[in-house]
């Protein structure tokens, strides 16, 4: 059955509704076609019917039929915390603190650069990076040589780069945040974006902003902030009050 799910994803270009309808209508398949596509896979995966499929994804809207990954999928069985923005050396102590509290640190690949990834690797911090294009990870020999696959995981709903760019942010957001996982923001400039991201999820998500100072928050419009459906759980933690 797992092979069939993978085949349907590939056949229907990872479009959730099309895959769902094909399965519901019991679309005819040729087992030879299934096997031909299956052997082309160059990465690991777990499907929605696999016991290692992340539990939190069962509760999101349109849960992924499969996730493709490089690294340790068991990290999803631990408590996660979503980090918005890039990592800089000055934030390392906070990341170490979170890791010491047994949190797995989760990032979006488009928001974390090579320097940030290197900081995670060099300091042996457990992390998950969500990417639209897993092929760029699989083809990065330099990165694969550096990582400890027991303490990290790169994941995507798509393993074929041809379809990665057309993927909408909604799908990536519900995959990244899930339901109830706390969010930490190190870059206060990203706050405008986070409003829309969280509003899509329809769930209570605690959000914490680690800010250098309060100046950038003096002109925030409260009506805008109330777009965050968990407004009362929004907290700003200032490193230096000035």
Residue ranges and their predicted role:
Residues 1-50:
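Short, small/acidic-rich helices and loops at N termini and domain boundaries
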Residues 49-242:
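Glycine-biased, small-residue-rich flexible motifs in mid-sequence functional cores and linkers
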């Amino acid at each position: 059955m797992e092979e069939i799910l993978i085949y349907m994803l590939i056949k229907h270009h990872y479009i959730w509704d099309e895959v769902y309808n094909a399965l519901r209508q019991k679309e005819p398949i040729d087992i030879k076609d299934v096997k031909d596509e299956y052997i082309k896979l160059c990465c690991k995966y777990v499907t929605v019917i696999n016991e290692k499929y992340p539990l939190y994804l069962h509760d999101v809207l349109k849960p992924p039929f499969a996730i493709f990954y490089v690294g340790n999928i068991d990290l999803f069985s631990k408590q996660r915390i979503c980090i918005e923005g890039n990592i800089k050396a000055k934030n390392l102590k906070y990341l170490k603190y979170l890791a010491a509290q047994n949190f797995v640190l989760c990032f979006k690949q488009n928001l974390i650069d090579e320097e940030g990834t290197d900081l995670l690797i060099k300091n042996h911090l457990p992390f998950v990076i969500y990417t639209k294009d897993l092929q760029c990870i699989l083809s990065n020999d330099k990165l694969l040589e550096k990582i400890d696959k027991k303490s990290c995981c790169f994941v995507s709903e798509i393993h074929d780069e041809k379809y990665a760019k057309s993927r909408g942010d909604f799908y990536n957001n519900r995959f990244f945040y899930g339901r109830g996982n706390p969010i930490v923001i190190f870059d206060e400039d990203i706050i405008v974006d986070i409003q829309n991201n969280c509003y899509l999820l329809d769930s209570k998500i605690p959000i914490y902003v680690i800010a250098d100072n309060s100046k950038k928050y003096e002109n925030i419009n409260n009506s805008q902030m109330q777009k965050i459906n968990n407004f009362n759980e929004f907290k700003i933690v200032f490193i230096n009050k000035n």
